[in-house]
Swiss-Prot record:
Hydrolase that can specifically remove compared to 'Lys-48'-linked conjugated ubiquitin from proteins and plays an important regulatory role at the level of protein turnover by preventing degradation. Regulator of T-cell anergy, a phenomenon that occurs when T-cells are rendered unresponsive to antigen rechallenge and no longer respond to their cognate antigen. Acts via its interaction with RNF128/GRAIL. Surprisingly, it regulates RNF128-mediated ubiquitination, but does not deubiquitinate polyubiquitinated RNF128. Deubiquitinates estrogen receptor alpha (ESR1). Belongs to the peptidase C65 family. Its EC number is 3.4.19.12. This is Ubiquitin thioesterase OTUB1.
Amino acid sequence: MAAEEPQQQKQEPLGSDSEGVNCLAYDEAIMAQQDRIQQEIAVQNPLVSERLELSVLYKEYAEDDNIYQQKIKDLHKKYSYIRKTRPDGNCFYRAFGFSHLEALLDDSKELQRFKAVSAKSKEDLVSQGFTEFTIEDFHNTFMDLIEQVEKQTSVADLLASFNDQSTSDYLVVYLRLLTSGYLQRESKFFEHFIEGGRTVKEFCQQEVEPMCKESDHIHIIALAQALSVSIQVEYMDRGEGGTTNPHVFPEGSEPKVYLLYRPGHYDILYK
């Protein structure tokens, strides 16, 4: 009997370690599965797609899905084409960035205004307390893309830049920083729209600056105001009525960027 006691004493920590290993293996399995899903999404969806006929949307829903089929039909009265973005949580910023820069290829006056505002934006962020060393590379990439447009690059080359993961993600990071900066500058106004007892700064650190965090009204308003670029979003969901619900940010302005929103995702629209 005495010989068995050490074995019993050893079994307890072994069981504990085993559970720890199992938990770790489970966590790793989940992470591996998430990586596989992201890889599949990446293979199937470019960061920004070619321009497509809007009618491709019909095929994304069942023929007897009357709500969406009717809303697509309504959308077709106002728009002819769509350019899709990868559903990775960064789609709003990527869609905004490509849509506006593409439009600037044919609008030299707006290009010069936008370039001046964008050039000064780094200085504004630094004055707010953002570290220049931290944001400099992201700002440089942003300005490089604007200068690419200024040199009258082709839409195909601009699209290639946006589908380069590093370039595209650096642009997204900088647009997130601009959004955060504006929200914090205007914190007295925006604090009333933030739930959970968080400060505007906490909200920005948790919901705006990190990559892959989805965007809502508050993000759109802030970026539109920060760069003085009006955005019209067509909201398409399962709500009643056979029409999409357009919303212009800021209200009453003349839209320069047109986006389609379906729950959790933004794509680019063309008239």
